[in-house]
């Protein structure tokens, strides 16, 4: 080969290498992973919700879920690609084909074909599952990294790694080895992350750091976690990532380690007696935690193991092997013979050849209306008083062979010949008896006896043609004394309110319904609140006993006066009927208009007008328009004007500025019929400005006496009376003439002197303190009869001291008070002493001699006896003989 040939070969090689180096990864193409999918189902009958398989669509956007659609409405495709059965499905052909559609991000439509194959139980193929046990593990390599934001090829998607559950070990066990192409360039270290690696459950999977062997460390449980998603990482010795993380999906394959479980221990159902074969009774349901998509480990089959009782046939019921629906298979169900059946049902997986469990199904045979109710007896009699409703006449007895308290047993009674609806039959829910009662009052005078025909049926119709039982009831009506009946019950009479007293208004009578009795009716008024009416007890004629008044708001409502009239017969017992008399009172012009309000207030400054409404108790035309006029000089200070066209109100305002005070305004009001009246308005002018509603009422102009002034005047009068009384007492005392205590000296000879005071003996230091009592305060009340007492001030006497040491001061002070006491003896009373000593030292009266000389008549010594004898000394001492 020449130099040119070698150069050309080198150039071609260089171009090939350059083309290989510049080649970009294959772009992502949207679409299904496969053009068709084939799924195998274990049986021709599929229940609702059965999972058939899964399709996968790649739309190159990274979305985890896709919207799928199928034209076959029997199947549903979820957003995760899982295909399920929408409703119970039965295969008529060995295969079913249908299309599944999906759309990419540009709304291009893609489709794939799905085929369902059914296989017989005897040659059922089990799905192939690649297990790592006993075979050489697969080698996984990292895909070539791409530059930029480009997706990897679809060929790089790692298929799921299958690992059986419940393996025995030994552990750890190799699953797969992960290799990086960069291990030729240097040392590469491997690690994994994700569920089962570094997130719970942690440590289920591990990877050898240098060799890349992915291992499982313990037995797996598919019922706990069915799929693990891991990410493998490759880094260089200096810690730099040499590969992009690679997703690894580990699927735990199922083992038949769970037996079916019934949703209930005891299932209860019911079926009517006489049900035909094929009638569904109930459904039992069991579940299995094993895989029901890829294996038969959860394919449950139902069977009936036993039936109790086995009569009238040991196979009265059958169960659907796939759905668990129990149905009647044989005729002869009779509630009266066998009311219940107990079935033991079994649920087994692997289509009935695997693990199994049992449950109980209790079937109750319900009653049908195949027995009619029958009267026993068929004839009845009863009595009822007339005019009484809801009265029990008699009780009807029936028997029914059907189940008690069921619609087929409950009786329904019908009266065949009660056209007037006068009777009713109700059913006693406890014993099914019929209770015949009156629906409304009966009239003895109209009919004395009723013969009723009553039929009985059930709540539900008869299942077969049966004869309806009937009974005959004879009802006798008893005559009672009925109350008289007013005709009409409510009588309306129009009368003028000025109807004369004592005149007859109307006649209101009642008739006696008891035509077979001769009775007398007496009338009287039961309610007459205004006491306006009186009635003739024999004829029922009603007349007035007082003047009527339509405007009496207490007794008249809407111009109507209501009175109650009663009529009483003389039967036994006495019966009374009631009638209502409505007197419609027509209006007369008997009320003059009046103002409202009658008390008003104005402000002194800038007063605002006040509106006065005109009220008339009469009715039109005896009311508005009204005429208003100020009288008795009120128009000098005030003015009025009408407030509305109908003249039903006026406006009052002052003509000029008025002084603060109270004013009386005479206002004359006249109605449309010239009925007038003068009313006095109380008007107050307040010390305010503007609206009078914000000011207080002014003080009255006239001076008046208030309570404090009255009390002051009374106090002054009382003080004046006391002063006059004291003055009179003082003048009376001045007018008293002093009379000598002793007769003149000429008449004193040979006479015995009488003294008012009898001394208590000589002074003695020995005295009894207990006799002092309370001092002079305890002196007796002895009143003089010869001299009228005068009103004088009394000196103050000290009370007896508790300390005996102070008794001397007590005596001295009270002696001084007694000396200055004008009421002291001898002018007021005789002194009374409780203790006068144990004897008298005075000489006998016979030793007293009459004095005959002037010396003996010397009374100057009386001046030495103190103040107590001063008056006596003044009268007898120092005097000259005339």
From Swiss-Prot:
Residues 155-262, 263-375, 376-486, 487-593, 594-697 form the Cadherin domain. GO terms for molecular function: beta-catenin binding; cadherin binding; calcium ion binding. Ca(2+) 2 binds at residue 257. InterPro entries: Cadherin, Cadherin-like_dom, Cadherin-like_sf, Cadherin_CS, Cadherin_pro_dom, Cadherin_Y-type_LIR, Catenin-bd_sf. Residues 23-154 form a propeptide. Pfam families: CADH_Y-type_LIR, Cadherin, Cadherin_pro. It is found in: Cell junction, Adherens junction; Cell membrane; Endosome; Golgi apparatus, trans-Golgi network. The keyword Plastid does not apply. The record marks 700-701, 731-732, 750-751 as: Cleavage. The modification Phosphotyrosine is found at residues 753-755. Keywords: Calcium, Cell adhesion, Cell junction, Cell membrane, Cleavage on pair of basic residues, Cytoplasm, Disulfide bond, Endosome, Glycoprotein, Golgi apparatus, Membrane, Metal-binding, Phosphoprotein, Repeat, Signal, Transmembrane, Transmembrane helix, Ubl conjugation. SUPFAM superfamilies: Cadherin-like (SSF49313). Residues 758-769 are annotated as: Required for binding CTNND1 and PSEN1. Ca(2+) 1 binds at residue 257. Glycans are attached at residues 144, 280, 285, 358, 470, 472, 509, 558, 576, 578, 580, 637. Residues 747-767 are annotated as: Disordered. Residues 155-709 are extracellular. Residues 755-767 have a biased composition (Acidic residues). Ca(2+) 3 binds at residue 288. GO terms for cellular component: adherens junction; apical junction complex; catenin complex; cell junction; cell-cell junction; cytoplasm; desmosome; endosome. Residues 811-882 are annotated as: Required for binding alpha, beta and gamma catenins. The modification Phosphoserine is found at residues 770, 793, 838, 840, 846. Cadherins are calcium-dependent cell adhesion proteins. They preferentially interact with themselves in a homophilic manner in connecting cells; cadherins may thus contribute to the sorting of heterogeneous cell types. CDH1 is involved in mechanisms regulating cell-cell adhesions, mobility and proliferation of epithelial cells. Promotes organization of radial actin fiber structure and cellular response to contractile forces, via its interaction with AMOTL2 which facilitates anchoring of radial actin fibers to CDH1 junction complexes at the cell membrane. Three calcium ions are usually bound at the interface of each cadherin domain and strengthen the connections, imparting a strong curvature to the full-length ectodomain. Homodimer; disulfide-linked. Component of an E-cadherin/ catenin adhesion complex composed of at least E-cadherin/CDH1, beta-catenin/CTNNB1 or gamma-catenin/JUP, and potentially alpha-catenin/CTNNA1; the complex is located to adherens junctions. Found in a complex composed of CDH1, RAP1A and PKP3; PKP3 acts as a scaffold protein within the complex, the complex is required for CDH1 localization to mature desmosome cell junctions. Interacts with the TRPV4 and CTNNB1 complex. Interacts with CTNND1. This is Cadherin-1. It comes from Pongo abelii (Sumatran orangutan). The gene is CDH1.
